[in-house]
Swiss-Prot record:
The name this protein goes by in its record: Glycine--tRNA ligase beta subunit
Documented EC number(s): 6.1.1.14
EC supergroup of this enzyme: ligase
GO molecular function, one term: glycine-tRNA ligase activity
Lineage, top ranks: Bacteria, Pseudomonadati, Pseudomonadota, Alphaproteobacteria, Hyphomicrobiales
Organism: Rhizobium etli (strain CIAT 652)
Gene Ontology terms: cellular component: cytosol
Amino acid sequence: MPNLLLELRSEEIPARMQRKAAGDLKKLVTDALVEAGLSYEGAREYWTPRRLALDIHGLTARSADVREERKGPRTDANEKAIEGFLRGAGLSSVSEAQVVSDPKKGDFYVAVISKPGRATEEIVAEVMPGIIRDFPWPKSMRWGKASSKSGALRWVRPLQSIVCTFGPEHEETTVIPFEIDGITASNITYGHRFHAPEAITVRRFDDYAASLEKAKVILDAERRKDIILHDARDIAFANGLELVEDEGLLEEVSGLVEWPQVLMGSFEEDYLSIPSEIIRLTIKTNQKCFVTRKQGEDTLSNRFILVSNIQAHDGGKEIVHGNGKVVRARLSDALHFWKRDQGNLPDLETLAASAAKFGLDLQKPLDQRMAKLDALDVTFHAKLGTQGARVARIRALAKELAAITGADPALTDRAAVLAKADLRTEAVGEFPELQGLMGRKYAVLQGENASVAAAVEDHYKPQGPSDRVPEDKVAITLALADKLDTLTGFWAIDEKPTGSKDPFALRRAALGVVRILLERRVRLPLLATTRDGDLLSFFHDRLKVYLRDQGARYDLIDAVLTPDADDLLMVARRVEALTAFITSEDGKNLLAGTKRATQLLAAEEKKGTVIADGVSPALLKLDAEKELFAAISSASKDAADAVAGEDFRSAMEALSKLRGPVDRFFEEVLVNDEDAAIRANRLALLRLIREATGTVADFSKISG
């Protein structure tokens, strides 16, 4: 079957946009072809810095013929109805329509509309200009003389050429010649900008990809990534080092080169006195280079790895030299602000009031930065006040939480007042992603307690489902205070997540609270802390997501989660115990009996059947109902005692003793006895089953 090759070649596409753009191209083109009546066996997208390409194989040569019967009005309908039918069906007179008789509805017109299939070339030429013109780039531009005209083509960077060929796998292909803003599709492309700028004639994908590789363009982005990664590992190993791998940087760099050449540069060892995180970010952010470390060690080396798009005649010496100069200049700047952050601020006399407010020591650099943060009234959020006010709230909340977590109150207070201090450091000003981490380093340098220093960094954690959870009690306390302050604040001003929008990462903050409470076994009454039922419901949603990711069943979570359940650790423990119980043989059988009891009881309640207020032992006539009543009385007490002692497994074990009596009751006892008093008493007995199991879970919500 025929194949379609499409290439859109332009000036350099930003690396961050390439993968999505190629995926968008594939979806837009294949959707349009399928909508036009074509089918295909497979499609794959490709991208380089200067091109998006699409290979569609097994594409049908033409769309199928279509025959449609369109039912019209009765033959005796008014003239306007018939004229409307003819216009809609594309008929000039009723003589072109068929008349169909229906015994009940009479005679009516039917238009038979036949649409012959269309050649694939015609369909592609028709749909492609619209796809290109309406392409969903995040940012796009106009260029050239046509840019001043209304409706001028917009593309991420100036579009230079289009390749569009179609034909069988082993025969000559044809060019599908469509045109957009003066650019006509052809079978001509170009290779590497510097190494092979000559025109290349292509027929189909196989020779297209091979021709590009000869012209020093590796079309497959995953291959480019693989080449970069393995060459970088090899060159590092050859120098007694190992690559510090970075998947995000690898993805970006592979989108900057068409012919990757991996080289190694170096900088003076004096710069290794800068924290490794700053070195890594400086080299990554400014030069898109990888750092290395000594084999088997954590400390960085003074060698870095760069990826060039040019295979230089001198082996890359000039490229390495040029990159080295820039890296040294950037590291010199980094060393400067690293040292400045450890020094005194020039205006200490203006910070006395802020220092007094937070109990700060203006002889210490990090304390000075916190005082400066407060004195400048740096805004946290227009409706939530300044960073200083935020720190004061976190400090007060952390004091309350310390009594629950068991954290040292004095250390917790000290950590709270220093937690946001590094926001005024030059290091964090340059690299905001280092907030917390730099605060910890500066805290250590000025002699802070290890728990305080750890809390300054870790109070931001966890920042996602895979991030680690703080372990130190001071860090746990501060992390909870920070996240709870954020959540209660944004709930108070009605800035809640909506749909896919969550600009303040409130879902992440709530999940962080859930993970800390559960993974560090913290008992925290959230309603007493947040005083917001809607926010508690939000925590419940995050808890469900977390527990489901841990393998818990949704129905079991719903069975134990009540609207006012604000001790999430207890909810999780109930789910754990219920899961173990409900998967046992006793649990499965008790569930079946309990559901039968609750369903029967619910049906009678709905009908308004009289149910006794309590079970009367005198009205228990059969041994099975007497046995069940005794079992419920015993199991209910044991289960309630176990729940009171927060021993949910023992509560489940107590309830498991009901299995036999419940089974026997339904085998031997007719609930709807003719005697109304006995019936009401037996229904009351069923209610006791529901109440007994309800001490640990709502069994009616459990599937199965």
